[in-house]
Amino acid sequence: EIRLSLVGSEMCIRDSHYTCGDMLDLHNYPAPEMYLYDAQRANVLGEYGGIGWVVKNHIWEPDRNWGYIQFNSSKEVTDEYIKYTDMLYDLIIRGFSAAVYTQTTDVEVEVNGLMTYERKVIKVDEKRVREANARICKSLK
């Protein structure tokens, strides 16, 4: 059974490349890469990122946690995030429409968040991230 989605194909069938819905919704970790293009639909990177950093005393389970890639400091995490926004900027020229970073906060054993799970530590340099995001937003106008 195939159920149509108003948002994107990822929600209606397991193979997100099937031509249903209004979006081609790809998920790629960790780097934002679009490995397919569909001229008939919005091309969306529904998930990318997963930049991990274990912040001691701010993790769900000390002995069990992961990220798609691991770093050891706020600067390293921020640098990687900025690198990814530069990659997004390059994708816009090729017809890219949107992206969703995974994830805003750590979730249980996943340490991929921009903040710790209890939201007490912001793991990135907010000013640099804000500037990088603004550059992307301005390029879409």
Where are these regions (language model features)?
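Alpha-helical scaffolding within the catalytic cores
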Residues: 14, 26-39
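Single conserved hydrophobic/aromatic residue that forms the stacking wall/gate
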Residues: 1-13
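Substrate-binding clefts and catalytic carboxylate motifs of secreted carbohydrate-active enzymes
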Residues: 33-141
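Residues at the C-termini of beta-strands that transition into short coil/loop
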Residues: 15, 27-28, 47, 118
